[in-house]
């Protein structure tokens, strides 16, 4: 199984390490042709407007949308969650606009720039330490969206079919259960596409 990590900014190496720890091959993606042959893609954290500028500069917006349209799974963490969202509070336009969620940027407030919180994640388990760094949260989830985790009544992880997103940085701990959950989804999508 081959998983891409969008390598424009953010904790790219940490995601590669997590994917490899789960037994899959990781490929750092900086050009659209590198999307070919991938089974899934991780959109790492960082700063969402910077990532969007780089996506535009490298001509990746359409290829990323086509990758998703082909039924390939995508996992957005922190700023990557913002890239996935169809709606962003305070912005007219989404970035990739793939998942039926509304996201608010830096929504835990400046004084809580970074913190850790123990989460219970549906399908993953309890005692998962979420590392939040200038984190967004999901303000609203559409009907087809499965809420996987909340923190202080805010949605911090959700899944809609092939799209998985979380507010925190799962790659910054040695708990790879969420990466494994994503890889399981990739495996399911791969089996489904081979049956078509």
Swiss-Prot record:
According to UniProt, the reaction catalysed is:
aldehydo-D-ribose 5-phosphate + D-glyceraldehyde 3-phosphate + L-glutamine = pyridoxal 5'-phosphate + L-glutamate + phosphate + 3 H2O + H(+); L-glutamine + H2O = L-glutamate + NH4(+)
**Gene Ontology CC annotation, any one:** glutaminase complex
Q: What one GO molecular function would you report for this record?
A: glutaminase activity
**Biological process GO annotation list?**
glutamine catabolic process; pyridoxal phosphate biosynthetic process; pyridoxine metabolic process
Active-site annotation: 78, 169, 171
Pathway this chain belongs to = Cofactor biosynthesis; pyridoxal 5'-phosphate biosynthesis
Positions annotated to bind L-glutamine: 46-48, 105, 133-134
- Show the PANTHER family listed in the entry: PYRIDOXAL 5'-PHOSPHATE SYNTHASE SUBUNIT SNO, PYRIDOXAL 5'-PHOSPHATE SYNTHASE SUBUNIT SNO1-RELATED
Outline the subunit composition.
In the presence of PdxS, forms a dodecamer of heterodimers. Only shows activity in the heterodimer.
Q: Fetch the HAMAP family from UniProt.
A: PdxT
Name by which UniProt lists this protein: Pyridoxal 5'-phosphate synthase subunit PdxT
Task: Specify the species.
Answer: Geobacillus stearothermophilus
| Highest classification ranks of the organism | Bacteria, Bacillati, Bacillota, Bacilli, Bacillales
């Amino acid at each position: 199984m081959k998983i891409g990590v969008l390598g424009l900014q953010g904790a790219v190496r940490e995601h590669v390490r997590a994917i490899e720890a789960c037994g899959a091959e990781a490929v750092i993606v900086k050009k659209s042709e590198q999307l070919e042959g991938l089974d899934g893609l991780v959109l790492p954290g960082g700063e969402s407007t910077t990532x969007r500028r780089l996506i535009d500069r490298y001509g990746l917006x359409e290829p990323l949308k086509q990758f998703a349209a082909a039924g390939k799974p995508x996992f957005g963490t922190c700023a990557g969650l913002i890239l996935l969202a169809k709606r962003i509070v305070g912005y007219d336009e989404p970035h990739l606009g793939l998942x039926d969620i509304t996201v608010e940027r830096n929504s835990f407030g400046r004084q809580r720039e970074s913190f850790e919180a123990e989460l219970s994640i549906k399908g993953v388990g309890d005692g998962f330490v979420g590392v939040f760094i200038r984190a967004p949260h999901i303000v609203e989830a559409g009907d087809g969206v499965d809420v996987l985790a909340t923190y202080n009544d805010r949605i911090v992880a959700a899944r809609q079919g092939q799209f998985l997103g979380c507010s925190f940085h799962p790659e910054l701990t040695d708990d790879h259960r969420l990466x494994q959950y994503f890889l399981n989804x990739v495996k399911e999508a791969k089996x489904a596409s081979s049956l078509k």
